[in-house]
Amino acid sequence: MRIQIDAFDRKFNEIHERYLLLLSMTDKADLYKRPRELPMSFAMFSVGEYLLRSAAAIEQTFGGITTRLWDDPFEWTLPEKLTTTELVIDYVNESDSTRRRGMAFLDDDSALLKQIPAPSEIKPIFELLLDTVSRAEHFQGRAFAVFQMLSDEKLPRI
């Protein structure tokens, strides 16, 4: 059975669709625009930076599942490299392709119990995927919050 795997797959698809939606709503000039910094608050990043962090979390996890290489995609996801909305969309799609290849490795729900060496410790794949969904949605939520700070547009229902 693939009940849990299919649930994860749907969740990752939803995240991917929201990337594309937010990128289509974000003005090119606002992609890497940061809200003004306030004293005594956490550092804020741009819509583009948060979306890249979100997609990079997914790419790193599925790269680890498929190749056991837990490289942080930080170097090739810098705003200096991905300067346009189109390049960010290309990266988001590339991250999704990596995820699809990784999901194809999982034959049935019992595969989620398999323990693999993650970046800092051995974990079941289920736990890795749950953590990845959480991190990806967290960064994506921040991207939507920054979008709302910079724009007068109403956020879509998600």
Show the residue positions of the predicted features:
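Hydrophobic alpha-helical segments and helix-packing faces
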Residues: F12-I15, M40-V47, K81, T85, ...
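Extreme N-terminal tail/first-helix region
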Residues: M1-E17
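Short acidic-aromatic linear motifs embedded in glycine-rich loops, typified by GG[WY][YF]DAGD(H)
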Residues: Q4, D72-T84
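Short, contiguous alpha-helical
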Residues: D9, L20, L31-W76, P117-I158
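Amphipathic alpha-helical packing segments from all-alpha helical-bundle domains
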Residues: Y19-L22, S95
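Surface-exposed helix-capping loop/turn segments at secondary-structure junctions
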Residues: M25-Y32, G102-L113, Q148-L155
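C-terminal ligand-sensing/allosteric alpha-helical core of TetR-family HTH transcriptional regulators
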Residues: I15, R53-A57, T61, Y91-T98, ...
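Acidic/histidine-rich alpha-helical segments that form the ligand environment
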Residues: E80-I116, P124-R142
